[in-house]
């Protein structure tokens, strides 16, 4: 397993997470190819992080899968914009950290799954119980 961390990217974490969810569990080569054609700004950064994680582990891109792609909130740059009548409004410029983990893909041999037969049991019908005062008075008399 190898990791890559890219810090303080000027990109909203919520926008980057939409892209990060798409590539989790994919082959690294397929993930980078699909990110190449995405129009989003975050796709370029996530593709760079995946290629960096592959290089950090010394793997080939076609032999690893993206185990996890996590986007965390980083520092928020705060700016002020002048508004009417001498007031000012705050502009938030969010940044994010991207962490990608890749794992070498293992070739799994096909395993035959045995299906267990379900045993059905029939339940006895429930007894009628009356617990009201009137019903118990009728039974006693």
From Swiss-Prot:
Region named Disordered: 110-141
Cellular component, GO annotation: cytosolic large ribosomal subunit
UniProt-listed InterPro entries: Ribosomal_uL22, Ribosomal_uL22_bac/chlpt-type, Ribosomal_uL22_bac/org-type, Ribosomal_uL22_CS, Ribosomal_uL22_sf
Record bears the keyword RNA-binding: yes
MF annotations from Gene Ontology: rRNA binding; structural constituent of ribosome
Keywords for this protein: Ribonucleoprotein, Ribosomal protein, RNA-binding, rRNA-binding
Gene Ontology annotations of biological process type: translation
Residue ranges with Low complexity bias: 117-134
CDD domains noted in UniProt: Ribosomal_L22 (cd00336)
Domain of life: Bacteria
Xref: SUPFAM superfamilies: Ribosomal protein L22
Subunit structure: Part of the 50S ribosomal subunit.
NCBIfam families, per the entry: rplV_bact
The family this protein is said to belong to: Belongs to the universal ribosomal protein uL22 family.
Its job: This protein binds specifically to 23S rRNA; its binding is stimulated by other ribosomal proteins, e.g. L4, L17, and L20. It is important during the early stages of 50S assembly. It makes multiple contacts with different domains of the 23S rRNA in the assembled 50S subunit and ribosome.
Record protein name field: Large ribosomal subunit protein uL22
Lineage: Bacteria, Pseudomonadati, Campylobacterota, Epsilonproteobacteria, Campylobacterales
